Amino acid sequence: CKKINEAQKLRKLCESKIKLPVIGFKAAGTGIPLIKKLKEKEPFYASVYSRNVLKNGKSVKINKSTLGIELEVCYKIKRSFFSSKGIITMKNISKYISHIAPCIEVVGYRQRKKGITSFGDLCSDFGANIKFLIGPKKKYKKFNVGNLKTNISNKKNNQSVNGNTNTVYINPLNSLRFVLNKVKKDKKNLNKDFWVFTGSSVGVVPIKGKGIFIGKIDKLGSVLSLIHISEPTRR
């Protein structure tokens, strides 16, 4: 699926057939340069299943289909959101947020694909998320998340990539607003508190080898993951 509208339909149909518990939703395609490059109008969102979310510091096995690793801001949203009326705005959004945390997302395809040529590629693969690792959460207080320095590094591979939360669809709070309004429009109701992952502040960082990746976001703290590489099966 190259066209995002068709991919959205496919994703929603597939998600409706999956009976696994959903822990939240992710924003994808939130980098404005990527939106312009691929001539898309806006990001999209996808469901995130409980089995794909791990505790801080856990290990993740990757393979050839893995695109890379991301660092993002995630929010815990109160169950009361589902009974709210009207659209979510930047003025009323704070009352639905209970916690905020740094998060690592390992991204890659389930299908045999390489690279990103359209949002349809990502969307038809459920947003191409493999695993999420949530760092220590903090009780939410209003503060400016729109200009926080971020960094993800792996000392073993001599990798270090700097970023900023202002690359995430204006800012992570705006990305959250986008997702919540899409969830509301699609009449999703988890009937519980849930997480929203707002998109990468460092782009998609290639994983050059195994080791510990540490993600740091100013004012929020750190999150880490131990990356293992699956050995190809011999025939």
Regions found by a protein language model. Name each.
Residues 1-171, 176-177, 209-212, 220-226:
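Catalytic-core "active-site belt" of small-molecule-metabolizing enzymes
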Residues 26, 234-235:
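Basic side chains
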Residues 175-204:
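A conserved acidic, glycine/proline-rich C-terminal tail/linker
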Residues 201-205, 219-222:
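Short, charged beta-turn/beta-strand-edge "cap" motif at the junction between a beta-strand
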Residues 227-233:
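Conserved small/polar residues in nucleotide/adenosyl-binding loops
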